[in-house]
Amino acid sequence: MLVVAFKPGHDGAVAAIDDRRLLYSLESEKDSRPRYSTLLPTTFLDIAERLGAIPDVVALGGWADLRPRGVVYTGAGYEGTQEPTVTTSRFFGKEVKFFTSTHERSHIYMALGMAPKDGAPLKSVLVWEGDVGAFYLVDSEHRIIRTIPVMTGPGARYSFLFGLADPTFPDTGGKPRLNDAGKLMALAAFGDSADASPDIRHVVERVLKQDSMYPAPKAEYRDSVLHNAGVESEECKIAAALLTERLFETFAEVARRELPEGTPLYISGGCGLNCDWNSQWAQLGHFSSVFVAPCTNDSGSALGTAIDALTTFTGDPHIDWNVYSGLEFVHDTRPDPARWESVPLDHAALSSALAAGRVVAWVQGRWEIGPRALGNRSLLAEAFSSASRDRLNTVKMREDYRPIAPVCRVEDLGKVFHEDFEDPHMLYFRRVREESGVRAVTHVDGSARCQTVTGTSNPELHRLLSVFAQGQGLGVLCNTSLNFNGDGFINRMSDLVRYCEWREIQDMVVGDTWYRRIAGS
């Protein structure tokens, strides 16, 4: 059975599953298009070019848009766990099954289908994102048997706090910005909730109790200590730490009270990208295990709708998937030989260049699904000098308070970090060993969000890390996404060359070819 699913609204995407195997999950923002792009015709054409047959099932995820005349719904709409709609339709002349289910269900089934099989009679699912904040109990037949609402819009509340302190965010008519949550997560590490004044605590509790964040009610907070205080102010950092703590406490309290102890927990929604919260869920002790997918936010919603359709028709959500299920790199031009020399990739020589402080644009195979660079569309740099962090933030045109993530081969985890668990998709925090000296990837609170690499999960990157370890003692590097500021991953040679020449990057590796900028060119 070939299922193709489409995700409307922001983070537009299309996913294809054939006989339970994920073929592609394509996000429209990737290939240097604006972050959070809606589904583009080019993305539809990309999937159509690569599929060998017309699908048996065409699935449309639900969505809702707030317009001046009211809410406009797409497909099954945004909220709810009601049964999907299945009809017969036609798709390019072929009779197909047409399927649509809510956006909320896409998150639930994305988590269920991507998680390892578990024979537990009950499973707990958490969806927390911009609009939905709830737990669900799922039975052994993969049916949702109970919904436990906790809080509407946890992600929107989290993002709103950043906008509240940001003088550039409007007092009226604004919506919580999709990219502010990650910035607030970075700022929270600079603050201590114990330092919160009564005024800050009052604001945070107001945010938690606010009826709605759409539109963002900033004008109602004009009298607060956080209104336009500046995102790097001490007040904002302390409030960020406190809100991070209070949001987790609110959901954890409900989990302990309402969910059976010992069930596996599957986390979905944009808040699943918060590594602090993921670590706390894993340490809570209430669940037998915790699973978070690399595309836990809306980048995985099309895939979730496809899995929901698969479950409806077969009774089983589980799929065979690989995180590198995007498109191959496009060789649409050749770097100018007057400016770039090309040589076969020499891992030892490249490791020496990295150790000397060079930043390397690193491209391998198909792009990663989800928002995080996992070693196929990455900027790499040595991790021992804090200058690497500053250089990478300058290259990426990011705020200097933003941390840089490490990538580490599994053989060196215990030497670099206090916790040596594997995390191939960079979803949990761990504590850095000070004696490891990896200053570029150590956040202000001593934590890091590390991608772990084995010889099978990403062989080419593991080989580079192993050669680097031979010379430097540890197989660890800085790893951040290869993209223009505000765009998705770079995925074609013309954009890669333009980016590297603009941002003064001297080294590009594409597959097994190393392009080196010629001095003075």
Curated annotation (Swiss-Prot):
Keyword terms: Antibiotic biosynthesis, Transferase
Signal peptide limits: none
Record carries keyword Signal: no
SS bond list = none
GO BP terms: antibiotic biosynthetic process
For this chain, one GO molecular function annotation is: transferase activity
User: What is its pathway?
Assistant: Antibiotic biosynthesis; cephamycin C biosynthesis
Q: What is its EC number?
A: 2.1.3.-
Q: Which family does it belong to?
A: Belongs to the NodU/CmcH family.
Q: What does this protein do?
A: Catalyzes the carbamoylation reaction in the cephamycin biosynthesis.
**Name assigned to this protein:** 3'-hydroxymethylcephem-O-carbamoyltransferase
Naturally occurring in which organism (per UniProt): Streptomyces clavuligerus
Q: What is the lineage of its organism?
A: Bacteria, Bacillati, Actinomycetota, Actinomycetes, Kitasatosporales
Report the gene name: cmcH
